[in-house]
């Protein structure tokens, strides 16, 4: 597969990237301000071995006691780290690679973390961004809206969120919102994880939804996302789709735990505005898959779950336990409250749930990764060497031990 607009670096060990670029750009990461919906819980809980048995018992017990079903439609959880911690972790990984860093935090439908970061490190001018939930027909999409103008960020984000959460949506309103974003040259609108059936409507219905969405709004989408928490086979399909549409590619790590993003963009730009022009106008992109991305996805997901669910003694009371960060409305009139406000105040929940959490932590440990390597499908194994530019003369000059080494069958080509 030879792409015209993208160069891809696949690193299998840490490397100095200062000869490849000036700046590393980390997109799509989440902080304590990001409300992560839990409406998927019943869907997956019924499919997980062992857990499904206890889940059904709890569900039936709740129905018997309350006379109604468990309702996760409004329930959400919050990632454990504050914005400064997330920013510092992302910045360090990029700096350790010999690059200047730009970090774009994208909490769900919220710019609070960005505003606070801007106050704390204003001299670095971090972009003000968010992951915007865009309702569409019978589903929704997530659009990374990066680098809102600081003087208008609150105003624009309110307009976007009024559309997301408003009871009535006017005809043509979404067109107007996308056009508004497109008219701001330094803003980047990214369709995050486009092939993921996140709305759980089924693969074919999601494809129909995506095709219709792109037909209507694709001209205002500046890039598709290669996502750090999606399978390689899916990301490869996104690369192919971007090529067919003539749309640029960017990365999005989508981190929620304590580890840095596993994918970043490389650029010669010094500011996010310059980077946005590179993507929007020049339509060229340079991407690095960090060594951690090559690790089995299921193992990385479980490790992230374990980080999300562990105890953080250094955090303030009311936020250091996982059940302080999970909010649920049990229908008693008290609205959404942390689980710790219910009967979990002095305990860690039912024993079966404690056991399930321990199991997640065990299987998410690095020691268990060999097991996941054995069960990993061939199509999801990331190539061992970088196949990023097709310049055979350049490849010939690289050592076999070079983490950026290429072979003669480039995955991505510069023309």
Show which residues each predicted segment covers.
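Short, well-ordered beta-to-alpha junction loops that form the rim of enzyme active sites
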Residues: 107-108, 192-195, 253-255
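Divalent metal-dependent hydrolysis catalytic cores, especially in the metallo-beta-lactamase
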Residues: 52-58, 67-79, 90-110, 188-190
């Amino acid at each position: 597969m030879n792409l015209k607009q993208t160069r891809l670096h696949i690193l299998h060990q840490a490397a100095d990237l200062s000869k490849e670029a000036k700046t590393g750009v980390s997109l799509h990461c989440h902080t304590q301000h990001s409300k992560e919906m839990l409406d998927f819980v019943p869907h997956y809980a019924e499919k997980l071995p062992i857990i499904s048995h206890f889940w059904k018992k709890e569900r039936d017990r709740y129905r018997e006691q309350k006379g109604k079903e468990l309702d996760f439609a409004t329930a959400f959880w919050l990632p454990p780290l504050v914005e400064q911690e997330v920013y510092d972790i992302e910045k360090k990984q990029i700096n350790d690679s010999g690059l200047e860093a730009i970090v774009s935090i994208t909490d769900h439908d919220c710019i609070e973390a960005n505003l606070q970061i801007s106050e704390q490190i204003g001299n670095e001018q971090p972009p003000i961004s968010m992951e915007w939930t865009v309702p569409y027909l019978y589903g929704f999409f997530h659009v990374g809206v990066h680098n809102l103008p600081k003087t208008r960020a609150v105003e624009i984000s309110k307009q976007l969120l009024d559309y997301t959460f408003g009871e009535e949506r006017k005809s043509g309103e979404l067109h107007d919102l996308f056009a508004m974003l497109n008219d701001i040259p330094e803003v980047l609108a990214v369709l995050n994880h486009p092939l993921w059936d996140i709305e759980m409507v089924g693969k074919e219905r999601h494809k129909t939804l995506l095709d219709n969405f792109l037909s209507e709004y694709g001209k205002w989408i500046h890039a598709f996302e290669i996502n750090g928490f999606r399978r390689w086979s899916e990301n490869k399909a996104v690369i192919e789709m971007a090529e067919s549409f003539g749309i640029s590619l960017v990365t999005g790590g989508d981190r929620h735990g304590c580890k840095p993003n596993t994918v970043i963009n490389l650029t010669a730009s010094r500011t996010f505005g310059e980077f946005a022009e590179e993507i929007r106008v020049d339509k060229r992109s340079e991407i690095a898959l960090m060594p951690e991305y090559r690790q089995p996805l299921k193992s990385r997901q479980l490790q992230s779950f374990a980080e999300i669910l562990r105890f953080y003694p250094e955090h303030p009371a009311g936020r250091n336990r996982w059940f302080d960060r999970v909010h649920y409305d049990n229908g008693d009139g008290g609205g959404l409250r942390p689980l710790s406000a219910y009967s979990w105040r002095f305990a860690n929940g039912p024993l079966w749930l404690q056991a399930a959490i321990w199991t997640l932590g065990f299987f998410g440990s690095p020691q268990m990764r060999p097991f996941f390597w054995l069960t990993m499908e061939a199509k999801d194994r990331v190539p061992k060497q970088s196949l990023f530019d097709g310049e055979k003369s350049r490849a010939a000059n690289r050592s076999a031990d070079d983490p950026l080494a290429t072979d003669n069958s480039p995955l991505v080509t510069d023309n």
